[in-house]
């Protein structure tokens, strides 16, 4: 159901479909005028589900924080980050977001040596989405791209 | 000087650079949260200059006789140029004019059935920029994503 691919393994059609989905969810859906896409894409694993028409309907990117070289991510040994977590509006309320998160965590468990997953979560999703699978907030709420965020960690 | 490619000839690195620079200019710089990555790109040709992994100048070209999109209804014999940008680092060197001239020349030489080139121009550029290449206003000024635009055409 979910595909996990490094940037260089994506087809150009898949990459375009990912960017359409992210544009819909973040730029338009949340009216964000931040740089999207950004350079971290090229170092990320892209984790997504497509419908029969090839549209990406659920997406996130997974970043190896031990190796990342990017201004927006601090290096952390033994950790992966989840970011740009997105489900198309038309698919919401059907458990797709939950499946996406569960599958991504399982992928990190199975495919990497990471001992924890870190996320800068939009604050409104803290209790309803991330806490139920074991993510715990660390530190205070902060603003990023004008929206309240919290850092959360899941120990694997 | 300019590279021109069909969508399926683009590398992932090129598509990334194109999308990143379009969003940098149209979404971030102009503070306009609209869906720049709109799904039309697979049916366009992409003309660009890249420098150290960044896009200096870009436009996309498509044959309106083969595309039917809610923003761009089908019109036989018409080609559209769109998403015309120069990157922040490349401005003030005349590259934008070279780009538009190359786009027009590309349509002339490779699309013999096309008699008209259409653009939806940001209004402040109508005379200073597109008018210099022979484009003339064919509509009243209208707002698109809150930015004044005007339709312009160049008869070949």
For every predicted segment, state its role.
Chain A
Residues 32-34, 44-48, 59, 84, ...:
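Short hydrophobic/aromatic beta-strand element in the GNAT-like acyltransferase core
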Residues 48, 55-71, 81-86:
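Conserved beta-strand in the GNAT
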Residues 87, 93-106:
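Conserved acetyl-CoA-binding loop-helix of GNAT-fold acetyltransferases
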């Amino acid at each position: 159901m979910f595909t996990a691919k490094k940037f260089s393994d994506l087809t150009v059609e898949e990459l375009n479909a990912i960017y359409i989905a992210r544009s819909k969810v973040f730029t338009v859906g949340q009216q964000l005028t931040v740089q999207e896409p950004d350079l971290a894409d090229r170092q990320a694993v892209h984790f997504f589900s497509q419908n029969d028409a090839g549209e990406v309907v659920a997406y996130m990117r997974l970043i190896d924080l031990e190796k990342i070289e990017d201004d927006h991510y601090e290096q952390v040994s033994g950790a992966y980050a989840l970011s740009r977590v997105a489900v198309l509006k038309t698919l919401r309320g059907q458990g797709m977001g939950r499946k996406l998160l569960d599958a991504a965590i399982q992928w990190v468990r199975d495919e990497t040596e990471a001992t924890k997953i870190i996320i800068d979560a939009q604050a409104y999703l803290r209790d309803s989405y991330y806490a139920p699978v074991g993510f715990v907030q660390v530190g205070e709420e902060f603003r990023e791209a004008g929206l309240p965020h919290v850092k959360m960690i899941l120990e694997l | 000087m300019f590279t021109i490619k069909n969508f399926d000839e683009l590398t992932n690195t090129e598509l990334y650079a194109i999308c990143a620079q379009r969003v940098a200019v149209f979404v971030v710089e102009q503070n306009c949260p609209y869906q720049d990555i709109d799904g039309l790109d697979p049916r366009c040709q992409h003309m660009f200059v890249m420098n150290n992994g960044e896009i200096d100048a870009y436009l996309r070209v498509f044959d309106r006789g083969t595309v039917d999109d809610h923003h761009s209804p089908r019109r036989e014999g018409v080609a559209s140029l769109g998403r015309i940008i120069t990157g922040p680092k490349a401005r003030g060197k005349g590259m934008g004019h070279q780009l538009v001239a190359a786009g027009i020349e590309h349509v002339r030489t490779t699309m013999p059935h096309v008699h008209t080139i259409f653009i939806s121009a940001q209004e402040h550029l109508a005379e200073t920029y597109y008018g210099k290449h022979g484009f003339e206003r064919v509509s009243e000024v209208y707002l698109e994503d809150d930015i004044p635009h005007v339709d312009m055409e160049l008869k070949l």
